[in-house]
């Protein structure tokens, strides 16, 4: 269903993790959120989460004079509450949850998955698409495959939390599980809390 925004004139700046760029762009197009301006930070920051909050703070400070409405498309993302401390100071809200797996799957479903098997490694569409760049190469598993058991010895399964029904990504996720010697499970989530979180922010500007 397309969300009509003809009555909305006030732009909203969404500062997002680069890992969500494709999904947010798709949601913007499908819902007609033409007043939503997207600015992405490097997805690689997830490998250095201690840098995320400061980078967010800089972007908010730089753009808050131009935009009266700013929303952050991050969860906590391993920052130990640092993002929330920045956002509380600036009066800005973010997506719900501790991480993207949480808001894609939904808190209740993710809790069930985590409780069923604590030793679970999760992939999203983005991570399935960029598995080599964000998992294999940073851990140097391409150079030293024997390190696999060191990093993943306590894991039992890989769960692919897909946003789209894409056979190529499904095959890539299966291959990732094989590379890590983990059982494979596919759970289709769609856009989950990413969509509902952005929708709620849009509705604030329409009086809905």
Model segments located where?
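Long, charge-dense
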Residues: 82-134
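N-terminal basic/disordered segments at the start of proteins
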Residues: 1-32
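Gly/Ser/Thr-rich loops at beta-strand to alpha-helix junctions
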Residues: 15-22, 45-46, 73-83, 101-103, ...
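Short helix-loop-beta junction
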Residues: 29-38, 177-182
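A conserved mid-domain beta-alpha-beta active-site/ligand-binding segment of alpha/beta enzyme cores
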Residues: 115-169
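Glycine-rich, highly charged phosphate/nucleotide-binding loops
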Residues: 49-62
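A short beta-strand-loop structural module common to alpha/beta enzyme folds
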Residues: 34-52, 186-190
């Amino acid at each position: 269903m397309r969300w009509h925004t003809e009555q909305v004139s006030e732009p909203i700046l969404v500062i997002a993790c680069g890992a969500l760029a494709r999904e947010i762009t798709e949601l913007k197009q499908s819902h007609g959120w033409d007043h939503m301006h997207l600015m992405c930070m490097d997805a690689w920051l997830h490998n250095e989460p201690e840098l995320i909050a400061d980078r967010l703070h800089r972007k908010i400070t730089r753009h808050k004079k131009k935009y009266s409405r700013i929303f952050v498309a991050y969860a906590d993302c391993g920052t130990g509450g640092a993002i929330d401390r920045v956002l509380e100071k600036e009066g800005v809200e973010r997506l719900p949850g501790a991480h993207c797996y949480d808001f894609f799957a939904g808190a209740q479903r993710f809790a069930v998955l985590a409780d069923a098997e604590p030793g679970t490694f999760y992939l999203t569409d983005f991570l399935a698409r960029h598995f080599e760049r964000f998992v294999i190469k940073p851990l140097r598993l391409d150079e030293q495959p024997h390190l696999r058991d060191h990093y993943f010895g306590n894991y039992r399964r890989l769960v692919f939390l897909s946003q789209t029904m894409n056979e190529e990504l499904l095959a890539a996720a299966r291959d990732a599980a094989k590379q890590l010697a983990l059982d494979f499970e596919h759970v289709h989530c769609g856009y989950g809390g990413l969509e509902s979180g952005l929708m709620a922010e849009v509705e604030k500007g329409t009086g809905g």
